[in-house]
Design a protein with these regions (language model features):
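N-terminal G-site of the GST-like fold
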Residues: 1-43
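GST-like fold's C-terminal all-alpha helical module
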Residues: 24-25, 35-36, 40-130
Length: 130
């Protein structure tokens, strides 16, 4: 196949199948695609951000998105956001009952409210100036 086969896909499951023909689960996004090996490197958003932050050596010249002094705080907030927001969106989307949908919906918007409150002090980022 060669080239950017991920970009030639119409549906996400095609990207997963091109990466690993034996895959049979749900095709989710985001994914980090390696054009050279034609493989999905990772499909977990927090991991992808860490890879972008430190996985490119001297090619990465931007700010440190995961500074050592803030890692515990970042990880804690990411875990909370993942449980109630990221997972809440999936729970709402795949809900099979109105009650399950309503609970997931409430989690998603409670998380957005909490994040908005955190940012209401004028900070630009969830962890202050970084």
């Amino acid at each position: 196949m060669g080239g950017d086969v991920a970009g030639a896909a119409t549906y996400m499951h095609e990207v997963y199948t091109r990466s690993d023909a034996s895959v049979n689960g749900r095709a989710t996004i985001p994914v980090l695609w390696d054009k050279k090996t034609a493989r999905i490197v990772n499909n977990e958003s927090a991991d992808i951000l860490r890879i972008f932050n430190s996985g490119f050596g001297t090619l990465a010249t931007g700010p440190d998105l995961y500074p050592e002094p803030l890692r515990a705080e970042i990880d804690s907030l990411n875990d909370a956001i993942y449980a109630t927001f990221n997972n809440g969106v999936y729970r709402a989307g795949f809900a099979t009952t109105q009650q399950a949908y309503d609970e997931a919906f409430a989690d998603v918007f409670a998380t957005l409210d909490a994040l908005e409150l955190r940012l209401s002090d004028g900070r630009a980022y969830l962890h202050g100036s970084t």
